[in-house]
Amino acid sequence: RKSYIEYAPKAKANLPKPKNPLEAFLPGHFIPEMSLAELNMSAAVKNNDMAIITIGKSSGEFLDRKISDSFNLTKEEKDMISGVCNAFHKAGKKVVVILNVCGVIETKSWIGGPDAVLLSWLPGQEGGNCVADILAGKENPSGRLPMTWPASYNDVTCGADFPNTETVKVGDVLGM
């Protein structure tokens, strides 16, 4: 935590500055993941009973998802999962990945690494307390997903139609 608190302001300062004042109303750039090289992994393993990795993804107006870094994990995220799993498993300690995501993501390529994956979706204000209760064993995270998670983007049924690059005029749609 301390390493990230020191990393985040420096990384944010390196983000590109808006060129247009209207960009202040649009979603900003996300800071890149901190590399594992910047962490003292041996101290992290020694000082913790387990590792918790949180992967967050979001989308919304002006922030459509991309296959490369929203549906698929980035190289940095995959490296983080692999590196943390290797270090903690070597010491006989567990690793949990928490997915704080707005939609399905590819999991097939990395799901074998962590000991558990918890899908929290977008849990809101009390999400941290809910996740803590699950990790502490106070609550059972049982449930069923109301959908199937695709193994690859090719399995997403609407994938062929997104992003839609065809221009449609409102008048044409309304018959005007």
Each predicted region: which residue ranges?
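Secreted, periplasmic, or luminal enzymes acting at the cell surface/secretory milieu
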Residues: 4-28, 91, 100-176
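Hydrophobic helix-and-loop "lid/oligomerization" segment in the mid-to-C-terminal part
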Residues: 6-88, 99-112
